[in-house]
Amino acid sequence: MAQFYSAKRRVTTRQIITVKVNDLDSFGQGVARHNGKALFIPGLLPEESAEVIITEDKKQFARARVSRRLNDSPERETPRCPHFGVCGGCQQQHVGIDLQQRSKSAALARLMKHEVNDIIAGASWGYRRRARLSLNCPPDKPLQMGFRKAGSSDIVNVEQCPVLAPQLEALLPRIRACLASLHGTRHLGHVELVQAGSGTLMILRHTAPLSAADKEKLERFSHSEGLSLFLAPFSEILETVSGEAPWYDSHGLRLTFSPRDFIQVNEAVNQQMVARALEWLDVRAEDRVLDLFCGMGNFTLPLATRAASVVGVEGVQALVEKGRENAIRNGLHNVTFFHENLEEDVTKQPWAKNGFDKVLLDPARAGATGVMRHIIKLKPIRIVYVSCNPATLARDSEALVNAGYEVTRLAMLDMFPHTGHLESMVLFERM
């Protein structure tokens, strides 16, 4: 009878070695050298020495954990959050913000083989205008409300979260008390909080119908806190209990959105990012501009305030409809939105028949492989690529460089301080 064994990590004997860290990777791990290869050590900073235990040993690199830190870097910070190290939300609160930004910029520069010209950043605390907190109410135990543990599905009960917008953080204990008082706590899935330009939103996901008494209690809570409340009994259904359609500002334009629509988490960085895209593209009154993966028009509509015409292409129908509504609401009549799958053959899609002078694209983590060939065929003068995944950015950039484009500006977007997320934007110009 055949037997199957799960692959095991190659681990050395648990000997303690002393190392000195000389670098920090973009995820906030200290990097040392041992036996001629990189040794990654969470929790250590450059110029710190420590006794460590190797936990994983591979051909190209190894990992270790700290047994005893021997000195502290001047760039080490005391984490503000009492849940840091347990909650999986933040990985770098022990790292000074300047070092965080330098390490992310260095990683981006290495990957793109180009210096980082700009760091676009806002406040490093209180920046998150959106959060999703998991809910669980085990039998005979208090309601759990918080974020997932690092590497686990367990919930960390959070009483505070200093990266949340102050208005949202202040609500946490009162929301917990309200939800814990409901009769249907065992049917609660998660709660989403959004700080929109129009005020605070609360979206409550529940897996079974709420009683009339529970709904009434939630509505009273929403009125007393001055927030808009939405119930989500199923993934595709949203019931408005109180409040109106929310909106946020993008480069002076008011964009309404559905409470579940994607909006950038960091408002300050989003505003700077949109302004920088307009600057880099050097949009002029005669320009025809293409915005791919456009969402509800975060870039599209500001572009339309300057260009002769703008075309936005997006794969989610609801976002396309919202983009059209927002164009009308803002009096922009030179915008056309298309609902198309940009992972398919785009050459037969109606928007692809047009010519464009300049292109902006803001794809998801998978990147934009499906449209790169067509972008090159369009021969735009300038291309701005906004990325949430440096690996796919580097891959797609290679296609543009091979087609005669040159990277002329590279910016690191510090969209998520104290985390390992690395976002960026690049300007390509046709040579």
UniProtKB/Swiss-Prot annotation:
Keyword annotations of the record = 4Fe-4S, Iron, Iron-sulfur, Metal-binding, Methyltransferase, rRNA processing, S-adenosyl-L-methionine, Transferase
Which PANTHER family does the UniProt record give? Answer: 23S RRNA (URACIL(1939)-C(5))-METHYLTRANSFERASE RLMD, RNA M5U METHYLTRANSFERASE
Entry-linked InterPro entries: 23S_rRNA_MeTrfase_RlmD, MeTrfase_TrmA_AS, MeTrfase_TrmA_CS, NA-bd_OB-fold, SAM-dependent_MTases_sf, TRAM_dom, U5_MeTrfase_fam
State the active site: C388
Official protein name in the record: 23S rRNA (uracil(1939)-C(5))-methyltransferase RlmD
Q: What is its EC number?
A: 2.1.1.190
Q: Which GO terms describe its molecular function?
A: 4 iron, 4 sulfur cluster binding; iron ion binding; RNA binding; rRNA (uridine-C5-)-methyltransferase activity
The opening ranks of the lineage are: Bacteria, Pseudomonadati, Pseudomonadota, Gammaproteobacteria, Enterobacterales
* Residues reported to bind [4Fe-4S] cluster: C81, C87, C90, C161
Q: What exactly does this protein do?
A: Catalyzes the formation of 5-methyl-uridine at position 1939 (m5U1939) in 23S rRNA.
User: Whose protein is this, by species?
Assistant: Salmonella typhi
